[in-house]
Amino acid sequence: MSPPVATESMYKPTTIGTEAHDQALAAMKSNQAAPAKPVFKPEPAVNLEPIKFAPIKEHQVQRAMVRRYFQDMEERAISDVIIVGAGSAGLSCAYALGKARPDLKITILESNVAPGGGCWLGGQLMSAMVCRKPADKFLDEVGVPYEDEGNFVVVKHAALFTSTVLSKVLAMPNVKMFNATACEDLIIKPCPINPGVQRVAGCVTNWTLVSLNHDHQSCMDPSTITAPLVCSFAGHDGPFGAFCVKRIASAGLSEGLGDMRPLDMERAEDHIANKTREIVPGLIVGGMELSEFDGSARMGPTFGAMLLSGKRAAEVALQSLGRVKVEEGEVVGSAK
């Protein structure tokens, strides 16, 4: 037998007089009244000097920022070296290059607001940063402490390396970083040294928020930075991952991408550190971007090759610049 169907006649609401209802509600509230909350009374601060900031106008802040930013953009319209990506490899390259040649104008492009790439943490969001030897020598040079575990060393927190090398790089007077700025294309021109060969001659830049919204708003043209040499460490993931090697492939300047292979730490680190190189005239590639180009294994949460790939890129860059004659940021021939 089916259960009876619920109808209005079966379930009539109970009604009581308004006065009785109010009395019952008041009694219930009085019985359930919450105890008085304790009041925190802070102890008064004593013997503290008052803080009084110097006066300032809002327009002064605006002009101070705008003037310096656009002075930097004007000055760096021609650079000696552009570094794409301020992760562990890119920052290591900037440090080694800036230290070796303080006369070079080194411009760093970082698409994120926060530089550092994946080197704020170790593997799976854990803190420690593992570096296989001989990368410990670079840590010594930069001044990052670590624990020695035999064949490898451990920095207690990856952010300690990133913040240390970042502060040293940005303190160099010849280094300028534009963060929240994407490399969204490359400048490519005929190579004056090798007829019929194309040469990377700089970067096409835009603010990252603009680059990521081209699908929503048309006609948002970029800016450019001219340089005889670009060093790219754009990584392997994210919206701009491996950007430069992908652009080289799409422009028909390489046979294509090798695509990163599955993880093998030993093979991966040896390959990345030793194969960092100038893949086409004017473009040096290192770090995990190189694994996408060469089709080498990924290395996972070990960072030694990132550091030494950046350092090797700086060495390759110095040799490359020594072979060319440069006028107004463009290679015009071979060095005599």
Curated annotation (Swiss-Prot):
Entry comment on modification after translation: During the catalytic reaction, a sulfide is transferred from Cys-219 to a reaction intermediate, generating a dehydroalanine residue.
Reactions that this protein is recorded to catalyse: [ADP-thiazole synthase]-L-cysteine + glycine + NAD(+) = [ADP-thiazole synthase]-dehydroalanine + ADP-5-ethyl-4-methylthiazole-2-carboxylate + nicotinamide + 3 H2O + 2 H(+)
Molecular function per GO: cysteine-dependent adenosine diphosphate thiazole synthase activity; iron ion binding
Cellular component annotations (GO), alphabetically ordered: cytosol; nucleus
Enzyme class per UniProt: transferase
EC number: 2.4.2.60
Cofactor note: Binds 1 Fe cation per subunit.
Localization of this protein: Cytoplasm; Nucleus
Cystine crosslinks: none
Stored InterPro entries: FAD/NAD-bd_sf (IPR036188), Sti35 (IPR027495), Thi4_fam (IPR002922)
Any single GO BP term: thiamine biosynthetic process
Cleavable signal peptide: none
Pfam families referenced in this protein's UniProt entry, alphabetically: Thi4
Residues involved in substrate binding: 89, 110-111, 118, 183, 221, 236, 288, 298-300
Keywords noted in UniProt: Cytoplasm, Iron, Metal-binding, NAD, Nucleus, Thiamine biosynthesis, Transferase
Known function: Involved in biosynthesis of the thiamine precursor thiazole. Catalyzes the conversion of NAD and glycine to adenosine diphosphate 5-(2-hydroxyethyl)-4-methylthiazole-2-carboxylic acid (ADT), an adenylated thiazole intermediate. The reaction includes an iron-dependent sulfide transfer from a conserved cysteine residue of the protein to a thiazole intermediate. The enzyme can only undergo a single turnover, which suggests it is a suicide enzyme. May have additional roles in adaptation to various stress conditions and in DNA damage tolerance.
PANTHER family with a match to the protein in the record: THIAMINE THIAZOLE SYNTHASE
Record-stated family: Belongs to the THI4 family.
Subunit composition and interactions: Homooctamer.
The protein, known as: Thiamine thiazole synthase
Organism: Puccinia graminis f. sp. tritici (strain CRL 75-36-700-3 / race SCCL) (Black stem rust fungus)
